[in-house]
């Protein structure tokens, strides 16, 4: 296992491991751009399996002021080296009073599901780009994605984590969505 970047070990979110890539160059398909295929390597198609909450049409979701502030903060600070989505999203959440812990992005989903500042909803993965600002999207781990992925929707079809990119809609694993209350 690689040690990651200096200064990342020992913190709640650091752990010394790059999130989403495991330290292996090219292992993280979301570095440098969103995956566009079916996940490759026999990975399952993206789905809402494992998500709880009602199914919703993201076009009908009213955003919140708190969600807009969270998205603005995440976008302003999305300047990481790549591969550290959980660290950067965790820092943005922490600045807004929400703490998540663990070594991998997918671990944030169960914590957000229990947090009173969020409500979980089911959203068709192809519609994730329509989410309001501040929605947190958590992709599960799977083949080629040992840590999963987490991001904060910016409300314009883009997401922020350690980088700003088009909202990922096909990661090859199941997805859970959390809306700020």
Residue locations for each model-derived region?
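Structured catalytic/translocation cores of nucleotide/phosphate-coupled proteins
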Residues: 2, 62-63, 140
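Arginine residue identity/basic-tract feature
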Residues: 94-95, 119, 165, 176
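N-terminal capping segments
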Residues: 27-109, 113
């Amino acid at each position: 296992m690689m040690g990651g970047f200096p200064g990342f070990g020992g913190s709640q979110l650091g752990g010394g491991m790059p999130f989403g890539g495991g330290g292996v160059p090219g292992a993280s398909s979301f570095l440098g751009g969103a995956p566009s295929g079916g996940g490759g390597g026999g990975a399952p198609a993206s789905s809402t399996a494992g998500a709880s909450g009602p199914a919703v049409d993201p076009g009908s979701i009213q955003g919140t002021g708190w969600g807009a502030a969270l998205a603005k903060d995440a976008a302003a600070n999305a300047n990481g080296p790549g591969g550290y989505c959980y660290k950067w999203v965790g820092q943005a959440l922490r600045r807004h009073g929400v703490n998540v812990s663990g070594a991998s992005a997918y671990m944030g989903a169960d914590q957000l599901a229990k947090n009173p500042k969020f409500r979980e909803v089911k959203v068709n993965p192809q519609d994730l780009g329509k989410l309001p600002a501040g929605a947190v999207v958590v992709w599960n781990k799977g083949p080629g994605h040992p840590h999963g992925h987490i991001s904060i929707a910016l409300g314009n079809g883009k997401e922020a984590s350690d980088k700003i990119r088009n909202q990922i809609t096909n990661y090859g694993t199941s997805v859970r969505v959390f809306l700020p209350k």
